[in-house]
Amino acid sequence: MKKKLIREQRSLSRKYENIKKGGSTQKRNIQKQRLKIQKLHHRIDSIRTDYINKTIAEIVKTKPSYITIEDLNVSGMMKNRHLSKAVASQKFYEFRSKLLAKCKENGIELRIVDRWYPSSKTCHCCKNIKKDLKLSDRLFRCDCGYIEDRDFNAALNLRDATTYEVA
């Protein structure tokens, strides 16, 4: 879908370039191309929203007693030019607000852990904090012998977190 959007945007750009060079591209063709791009943006947006709704429904359907999420610094992530496009497309705020509404509707406690909680750097077994863990390290290896996927280890630590705020 993204490739199709890029292709259509390139086509629109060529139409504008043709006008600048003194060529003959009709305004009607440009309007049609803009409409195609708007429809593609709307379709991609609908797909993302649908994915969020289905994910939240799947989480709530398991009827947990509580759900723990991390309070992410989205505005800080948006300042990083390498992350900003990916972060914006994930719709973190929409996910969080819809999850909060579903939790209230179903009587599920939503726990929000502070963004500075070292969920990724803490060993789930021995609770030792590994200070030198880089983002590129995808496997968490502790001195106690515990080896696990970094994200799964963080999820276990968030589940067992004792300092949180109830939303």
Segments from the language model and where they lie:
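Positively charged, helix-rich recognition surfaces that bind polyanionic ligands
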Residues: 1-167
